[in-house]
Amino acid sequence: MEIKRDVYLQQLIERKDNGMIKVITGIRRCGKSFLLFTIFKRYLLENGIDVDHIIEIALDGIENEELRDPKVCFKYIKDAMKDDGKYYLLLDEVQFMPRFEEVLNSLLRMSNIDVYVTGSNSKFLSSDIVTEFRGRGDEIRIYPLSFAEFYSVYDGDYDDAWDDYMIYGGLPQIVSFQSERQKADYLKNIFANVYLRDVIERNKIQSVDEIGILVDVLASAIGVPTNPSKIANTFASERQMSYTNKTISNHIDYLADAFLISKASRYDIKGRKYIGANMKYYFTDLGLRNARLNFRQQEPTHIMENIVYNELLIRGYNVDVGVVDIFDKDKEGKRVRKQLEVDFVVNQGNQRYYIQVAYDMTSEEKQTQEFNSLRNIPDSFKKIVIVNGSKKPWRNDEGFVIMGMKYFLLNANSLEF
C-alpha cells in the first residue's frame, strides 16, 4: 500500500533543475526517504532520466558509514558521474556527515548535477541553507500524513479514521498496523529510542530526566500559552526540581530543532505587532504526543486545535496566535481592559484569515466566546470558525464562515469558501 504524497512531489517537480540545493526537512519517520528514493526517483525514471544518472546515498545506513566522511563522499559522487550528462543526487539524512555544507557547495559549482538532500534536524539545516548556500538553498518541509492522506489509505469510514487519527497521529508506519496495541507500542518505542534519544545525544544533554519531564509538561499543555518561567515554576512546585529558565528555553529549542514541536507566537491584531514571551506549543504528530502521556489526557478540544494548526502549516500558511484588546465593564461597572484570543492568525502572501476552533458550539455561551473575538477585529479579512463534525460551510448573519472539521480537512481550498 503506497501513500501518495502528491503535494510534496509537485514541490520537487517545480524545483527540478533550478540550480539550487533542494533540502527536504522534517521529523524522522515522516516519509522523507520514501518521497525521495521511491516517489521522486520513479518520477525521474518515468520522465526519461537514465537510472545510471541517479545517485542514491542513505547516510543513516551502516553500509554507507564510510561515506559520512565528506572527502570520501565527494569522491564517490564524482566517480559516479561518468559523462557530461545531467545527474541527480538523492542524499538522505545529510546531518550524519560533518561539514556537509562544504560538499554541497562544491556540488553547486558543477553545472551537470541536480542535488536533493534530506535531514531531520533544523539546527543543522535551515540556518545553513541561508548562511552557507548564499541564497542557493531551497527548503521543502515535509510533515507526517495530513488527515486527507491518512484517510485515503484508511480501511474504514470517516468517523473511525478521525478517531484513530486523533489518537495515533499520522506517521506513515501507523497505517500498516492492524491492532491498537501495535500502534501504541510503536509510538512509545520510537519516541523514547529514536526522537528523544536523538535530541539528548545530538545536544549532549546531561539532565536527561528533566528534558523527559519537560516533554510531558509541553504535551499536557498543547494550545496553552506558556513560557520558560512558568514551566520552571511548575518544576519547582510540583516536582521539587530546579530547572533554570535558560536551560528550559534551550531544551525547547532542541525539541523544535528536531521538528518534534512547533512554536506559535502571539500577535497583537490591533497593534500589528508580536507581543510577550508567552508562546503556544503544538506537537508535529499527535500520536507521539499521546504516546508520551501513555494515551491519557485525550482532550478533544486541544487535540482538534493542534490538528488544525498542523494542517495549516502543511498547506503552506504562516500561523500565529491572535490577541485582541478590548475595553469592557466588570461586575462593578468599572471600565477594564480585556484580552480576547483568536486561535489562529493565518497568512499567505497578501491573504489573511482569522480562525477559531471549537469542538462544541451548542451553547449560547460558547458561541459568544468564539464570535466575540472575531467581532472585535477591525479589518475585513475572512473570519472562520471550524467546528467538530461534518457541517458544510455556511455564513452567519455577521459574515463569519462556519465549517465542519471534515470539510476543512478534506478540501485543500476550504478556506476559500
Short names for language-model regions:
Residues E2, A148-D325, R337:
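Interdomain hinge/linker elements that couple catalytic modules in large macromolecular machines
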Residues I55-G85:
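Short glycine-rich substrate-engagement loop in P-loop NTPases that contacts/grips substrate
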Residues K123-D138, V153-D155:
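Short regulatory helix/loop adjacent to the ATP-binding pocket of P-loop NTPases
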Residues G19-F37:
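Walker A/P-loop nucleotide-binding motif
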Residues E2-G19:
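Pre-Walker A adenine-sensing motif
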Residues D114-S120, R141:
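Structural recognition of the conserved hydrophobic beta-strand(s) that form the central parallel beta-sheet
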Residues K82-F100:
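Conserved P-loop NTPase "ATPase switch" module shared by AAA+ and STAND
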Residues E2, T25, F34, L45, ...:
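A cross-kingdom feature that marks ATP-driven nucleic-acid transaction machinery
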